[in-house]
Every structure is written in structure tokens, then in C-alpha cells.
Amino acid sequence: MNESKLTFNLELDENNVPKKIIMNSSDNQAKDVSLKSVMIAAWDETTKETLRVDLWTKDMMVNEMFIMYHQTLISMANTLSKSTGQDKLAGALRDYCEFFAQETKIIQSNQD
């Protein structure tokens, strides 16, 4: 059986806020990748709940967070469509992504 390990090393400040996040993988697909943020969601099959780890460094700007959220939501819509065939629900999520992007001003409105 093949195995691969993904690790995140954190350098914390005196208040335990991440100053640095470094990602590595045992298969060398990721080697010392410097991250400003990481969001991990995992499904606990026993409790039927999503477990979450959300970390970001002090130097991550709000606009960068908006872009990350937008890209994550788009990816979730694509995965929803691909994995379940629920294109209508995925489309609704994409519509929300458009609204989110306009409200956060990470993209220009077609009406501007």
C-alpha cells in the first residue's frame, strides 16, 4: 500500500498566533511551501460532523482572505457538481460566489 504524509509546521508568536506556516509532503510534491493560511475540513464518520482547522498568519491581509474564501467556495461548487451531479445546487453556490466577489470588491461588477 502506498502512503503519503502531509505536514504543516507552525512557528507561533508569544500569543500562539501563527507567524509562519510551512507545508511539506512525504512524496515531495510540496517541499517547504510557505503559506499564509490553511483551511482543512474533514468528515468524522462516527459523529457525522465536519472537523475544521483554520489557521492564518498575522501578515495575511483581509483582501487575501477574501480571495482565498472566494476560490475555496468556487472549488466547493465544482466538487459538489462533480461528486454528486447536483448542478443546480452547484450553480446556486457559484451565484453566491459572484455576489461575494462583488461585495468584497475582488472582482468588478459587470454593471461598473
Feature locations, PLM:
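Short hydrophobic/aromatic patches at helix-to-coil boundaries
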Residues: E3, L12, Q108-D112
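Active-site and channel-lining beta-strand-loop segments
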Residues: L6-S25
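Short alpha-helical interface elements
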Residues: N16, M60-I67, R94-K105
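C-terminal charged interaction modules
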Residues: N78-D112
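Structured beta-strand/loop patches that form or line metal/cofactor-binding pockets in enzymes
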Residues: M1-F8, K31
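Active-site- and interface-proximal helix/loop "cap" or "latch" segments in soluble metabolic
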Residues: K19-G85
